[in-house]
Amino acid sequence: MAVPQIEEFYDKFSAVWEKPINSNIITTGYHINEEAVRVMKKVGITSAQITLDGMKETHNTVKHLPSGEDVFERVISNIELLNDQAPEINIVIRVNLTHENKHEYPQLCSLYVERFKGRKNIGIAPAFVLDRGASNCDKCEIKSTLFNHKERSEFILDLAYRGFNSPFIRYPEPFFNECAIRNDMAIAFDPEGYAYKCWEVIGNKEYAIGKLNDDGILTDINQTVLNRQLYGADTFDDPACSKCKYLPICNGGCPIQRIENKFEGGHNDCCTYYKGFTSDFLKIHIARKKAQEAATEK
């Protein structure tokens, strides 16, 4: 988790920044301990996304250690530790799903209810590993395990029909936002000082817009990459999207995927999971709203 570096950065940044600081963190959860919690509270972290890759056997296969340690149980215990010592931090358990482990999500939901019963500020949500249409992956064995647009929507709806809640089922979406990639004030850095506009491509230097020098100044600006990421993914410049009835409630889809499609020959499906299934989502929304109203009247 680079806890000492997080604290060092906060100390230096807060010394020159007088306005409030709001921080979030994405982590495997393995390295959370009392010292990590202390630093997380100090730097003002308000939410933590902790990733699971399935039930115990599956997760320990993906996130395995040579020692054979039960990584899954350690992560679950660390979630409890974080919630005990910093109950104000909102924890979201993100479950990476493919066709190989999708059947484990309901099991994880049951474990979540059993293990975290009575606790506040802990949630769970599926995260779909999508077929991004990579041209070099047409014959990959892994391709058949990935979700496409239709399969993702059907899985979300199936969960709802079976009584499992998820952020995807909320209709309409509770907020509208724009991706940070097109915000000229948003930036991320890798350990070597390379700068990126998108979290998803951190570490892939082809997407770096520049690099910090020894004085902390951003240099070697790649104007082509920067302009593509700031302006090359405008949904309203896409003729098909500009005529689509789902715009703007779809938020335009993922900009980096649009950039891959436009400039790199990608075949990403950037459409909302509502598309083609709006009536199904609306029926669930109306049924749940009526149930809530009926419960309130009792």
Regions found by a protein language model. Name each.
Residues 57-184, 188-192, 208:
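Radical SAM enzyme [4Fe-4S]-AdoMet core and its adjacent flexible, acidic
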Residues 192, 206, 213, 236-298:
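Radical SAM enzyme core and accessory elements
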Residues 144-173, 200-245:
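C-terminal accessory region of radical SAM enzymes
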Residues 1-58, 65-74, 95-107:
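Canonical radical SAM enzyme core domain
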